[in-house]
Amino acid sequence: MAKAKFERSKPHVNVGTIGHVDHGKTTLTAAISHVLAKTYGGEAKDFSQIDNAPEERERGITINTSHIEYDTPSRHYAHVDCPGHADYVKNMITGAAQMDGAILVVASTDGPMPQTREHILLSRQVGVPFIIVFMNKCDMVDDAELLELVEMEVRELLSEYDFPGDDLPVIQGSALKALEGEPEWEAKILELAAALDSYIPEPERDIDKPFLMPIEDVFSISGRGTVVTGRVERGIVRVGDEVEIVGIRTTTKTTCTGVEMFRKLLDEGRAGENCGILLRGTKRDDVERGQVLSKPGSINPHTTFESEVYVLSKEEGGRHTPFFKGYRPQFYFRTTDVTGTIELPEGVEMVMPGDNIKMVVTLICPIAMDEGLRFAIREGGRTVGAGVVAKIIA
């Protein structure tokens, strides 16, 4: 069977559904798929296809996730939905499914519930930039005042976590009724799609961001100088550009005097490409794996940060026993392990395998980092946790 050609002409945006268990996330995902396919063309996915989420492994962590695609007239969306709460936690922390925006589903029959709050907090910690609210099951609430009350509660909760609760779009609808084809509720799904189009800005492409390449290997080529190799994470580097070597040691500046890929010389290296970069006047011993090459001033080295961490369960190959404060594992950033110590939140004595927890990490040497950077926690080369930098402290 021929694969459909990937449509690149429209901007591509990644979204997903979040919210409390049984509030209708998967039903809404199916409703969006159906209503948009019916209105704008495309393939409709059934509830059962989405609910039966395939198992994926991201950094050794088992996550069940459903990916569907749909189109509006102006955009192409990739949408992720998870069956269980634990899957959301893992997904958001590992960045397995990066979201440019999230649809928070709240059943108007219940209002905000504990996981509603937890998903909003996680969105804040892992850097989901925009949230749109879909109040579901509105067909089951006769009282307009009650709907208003729930909307107010949700807006206040979002404001509590520094999302613009007063200004973000809230759509009142019924995913099930829309899925059953009732026109007044289908219209609400189109309203939601229009909100996605207008409220979530087009994401900046990796290639338009400032240049950054994690250094994987260093060679010296006699008569030419030092070459560092790696995969360009973002941006473009051109021959003649000034670059910085950041992390582990004192930051130094140098110039890119050559870019090569598959033994061919190029004028530039772009996001996603594996290349070798020749550095002017840099000695082989001045650079090491674990540092990054970047556009000057675009990223700084840090040692202390607040993070959101998921600790692998025993079944996932993680630890069999809890850990306590003073735990000193390795933190794996991009290409290297750095030892660090942890500080647990007040009142938390120990962390069990399978938990997710906020912790402050202090590394023994600085690493180039931005908020939103993912890392793994390892003991002797074995992954025991996954985390994301939520806030840089020092």
Curated annotation (Swiss-Prot):
Annotated CDD domains: EF_Tu, EFTU_II, EFTU_III
Stretches the record annotates as G2: 60-64
Family: Belongs to the TRAFAC class translation factor GTPase superfamily. Classic translation factor GTPase family. EF-Tu/EF-1A subfamily.
Single GO biological process annotation from the record: translational elongation
Enzyme class: hydrolase
A Gene Ontology molecular function term of the record: translation elongation factor activity
Residues annotated to bind GTP: 19-26, 81-85, 136-139
Organism superkingdom: Bacteria
UniProt xrefs under SUPFAM superfamilies: EF-Tu/eEF-1alpha/eIF2-gamma C-terminal domain, P-loop containing nucleoside triphosphate hydrolases, Translation proteins
Protein name: Elongation factor Tu 2
Segments for region (G4): 136-139
Reactions it catalyzes: GTP + H2O = GDP + phosphate + H(+)
Stretches for region G3: 81-84
Compartments it resides in: Cytoplasm
Region (G1): 19-26
Family matches, as InterPro entries: EF-Tu_GTP-bd, EF-Tu_GTPase, EFTu-like_2, EFTU_2, G_TR_CS, P-loop_NTPase, Small_GTP-bd, T_Tr_GTP-bd_dom
Region G5, annotated ranges: 174-176
Subunit structure as annotated in this protein's UniProt entry: Monomer.
NCBIfam families: EF-Tu, PRK00049.1, PRK12735.1, PRK12736.1, small_GTP
Family matches, as PANTHER family: ELONGATION FACTOR TU, MITOCHONDRIAL, ELONGATION FACTOR TU-RELATED
Known EC number: 3.6.5.3
Binding site for Mg(2+): T26
Recorded GO CC terms: cytoplasm
Keywords carried by this UniProt record: Cytoplasm, Elongation factor, GTP-binding, Hydrolase, Magnesium, Metal-binding, Nucleotide-binding, Protein biosynthesis
